[in-house]
């Protein structure tokens, strides 16, 4: 499989999968070389609580970024954020991949119910969320802020 404009001699990387679509038999590839990483979000996300890309990846990893963080989240029905995120330092984009997902913002509730629905909120906007159905969402945050994490109890803030 070649993309338009790609040299016929250029190597093609594929994610190797075993089993059938949706089965647990998928295998994530790893680094192809020091500048390319091929993976499977459903498996790779487990390593960093859903985060696929950001400052927290090793500096030599192509998924390391000081500018942006990307998260793949699978939420069971009725999953809810334990506490509101307050004092957020980043801008965020949340895109619904599947399901039905509600984002709570001060004075406003946003329901994402069709694939591709999204919401963006800026720095300093408090937020919370609730999965009305089993949902898969992709979150992009910027900048990637070192020392910021969700505490085990569900609150968010700088790491001690």
Indicate residue ranges for each PLM-predicted region.
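A short, N-terminal "cap"/entry segment at the start of jelly-roll beta-barrel domains
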Residues: 1-77, 81-84, 157-160
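Short histidine-centered beta-strand/loop micro-motifs
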Residues: 61-64, 81-88, 105, 111, ...
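Short, conserved beta-strand element in jelly-roll/cupin
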Residues: 86-102
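Short acidic-glycine-tyrosine-enriched beta hairpin
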Residues: 107-123
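Short peripheral tails and domain-boundary helices/loops at the edges of structured domains
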Residues: 144-160
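Short, surface-exposed beta-edge/turn micro-motifs
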Residues: 90-93, 116, 134-135
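Ligand-binding loop in jelly-roll beta-barrel domains
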Residues: 123-148
